[in-house]
Amino acid sequence: MKKKFFLSKKISYPVVLLAATLLNAVLGIVFICLSPDRVAVHFNAAFEADKLGSPWMYLPAFVLPPFAAVGLIFENVRKGQKPQNRKPLKIILTFIAVLIGYMGWLMLVWCGKVSEIGQKAEAPLYILVCVPMGMMFIIMGNYLPVIKRNGTLGIKTPSTLASDYVWAQTHRVMGKVWVVMGIGEILAALADTFAKTEFISFGWLAASIVGCLLYTSPSPRD
């Protein structure tokens, strides 16, 4: 009886997250049904609509977040993660679910109002898009160093998976790099917004991602 109570208590948060994301999905579908038949589904660097399509193209942003909650429930039931990894996993998956849902509503509320090619979204989208992405890198960067070696969460290369020392050093360095990436992305978004530029945010993001991939890619000796 005590074990059953402990299990139900442990999965209560993922269940609440699942219920919230499912409710969000239902509301998103309702608003999609109420949207115009043709809306902006792609923007150029100046946030001018360059492609129109069905508002149902926004649907993935509403149906994907529940899978994060399902993943948490699955991990809690099977106890696949080390105790030190469970809190980072919960925080990272929760933030990803919230970020994807937020992007869905951003597209639906602001971008969904744009119905003509060349029309610009009337919103500070550099701040609304790039600042949350910067926050994601900061949060994940703070938790990278505390993640212990495992096969599902973290930076997985042959060398990191083979050694606790290499794993710890890689995640310690990349944690700092991701925090710098996040801060830089937020500052770049502010620069693009107030300096009226159109490339700093995405240029910084692309360069940061490429740099991370190059750093974590296996070397020939791995």
Residue ranges: model-predicted function:
Residues 74-117:
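Ordered, amphipathic secondary-structure segments that act as subunit-interaction surfaces
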Residues 92-97, 171-179:
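Select subsegments of transmembrane alpha-helices in polytopic membrane proteins
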Residues 53-64, 123-139:
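Alpha-helical transmembrane segments
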Residues 29-59, 153-162:
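Active-site and channel-lining beta-strand-loop segments
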Residues 153-177:
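Membrane-helix boundary/juxtamembrane motif in polytopic membrane proteins
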Residues 67-77, 139-154:
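Membrane-water interface of transmembrane alpha-helices
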Residues 8-18:
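Alpha-helical transmembrane segments and their helix-start/interface "positive-inside/aromatic belt" motifs
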Residues 215-222:
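Conserved small/polar residues in nucleotide/adenosyl-binding loops
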